[in-house]
Amino acid sequence: MLLLFDVGNTHTTVALTRDGKMFEKYRISTKKYETEDELYVFLKSLYGGTVIEGIATVVSSVVPSLNIVFEYFANKYGDGNVYFVSSTDYNKIVWNINYPKELGADRVCDVIAAYKEYGKDCIIIDYGTAITIDVLKDGVYEGGVIMPGFAMMINALFKGTAKLPLVEVKPYDGFIGKDTESNIRIGTINATVGAIKYVVENITKEYNTPPVIIHTGGHALYVQKIVDGVVDRDLTLRGMYYFYEEKKNSAC
């Protein structure tokens, strides 16, 4: 049994896994916990104390300040082992970028799982606080793209202006808005989907054979209707499991 934490800027996904199969998955606010005891109490309310005690912890985090919380948690309530995902600790893939250590752990997990399950040629689009596009070509990670996420753009308009409202993160059916809300949704959601389609189409030209396009993250379903590909909501979590398996086997 493993306890997985996918720590994002806004939300944390926590899941239990046995032999790579995910179950009892929850999405909580990243601001919900600031100490190992707060984290334990919160998890106990979800899983029960005996379930989460004495097992290994795997963490994919883009919030480095919380790493110490997971270290203390693993030592106090787990088996003392916490595995932090990093590209520099996974050598089954060549990371052909300038600074591999800077690559976000969530993106590392996405690439690992895509390589394991979909093959050597993949474009992975992850819709979180930021939208990331990652390029796997011939089994080599070639780099990618970072864009503002849907909610981030909507919040920027709301906070940066005096009169624009905070609108729902939802695509608009059309490209000419008749009111302020539809104008904002077109200018943020629809326009970003168009940008993603443009970027993916141009990246695809770099391949000799069509790559597998994978959508993951909270708003993946919005874009799949416009940018062809498969939706895989648990891609990051399974990448964490594969990372753990590699680390465990290399330590044997």
UniProtKB/Swiss-Prot annotation:
One of its GO terms (molecular function) is metal ion binding. Keywords: ATP-binding, Coenzyme A biosynthesis, Cytoplasm, Kinase, Metal-binding, Nucleotide-binding, Potassium, Transferase. Substrate binds at residues 104-107, 180. The active site is at 106 (proton acceptor). K(+) binds at residue 126. Its cofactor is NH4(+); K(+). One of its GO terms (biological process) is coenzyme A biosynthetic process. InterPro entries: ATPase_NBD, Type_III_PanK. One of its GO terms (cellular component) is cytoplasm. Gene3D superfamilies: 3.30.420.40. It is found in: Cytoplasm. HAMAP family: Pantothen_kinase_3 (MF_01274). Homodimer. Belongs to the type III pantothenate kinase family. Catalyzes the phosphorylation of pantothenate (Pan), the first step in CoA biosynthesis. This is Type III pantothenate kinase. It comes from Fervidobacterium nodosum (strain ATCC 35602 / DSM 5306 / Rt17-B1).
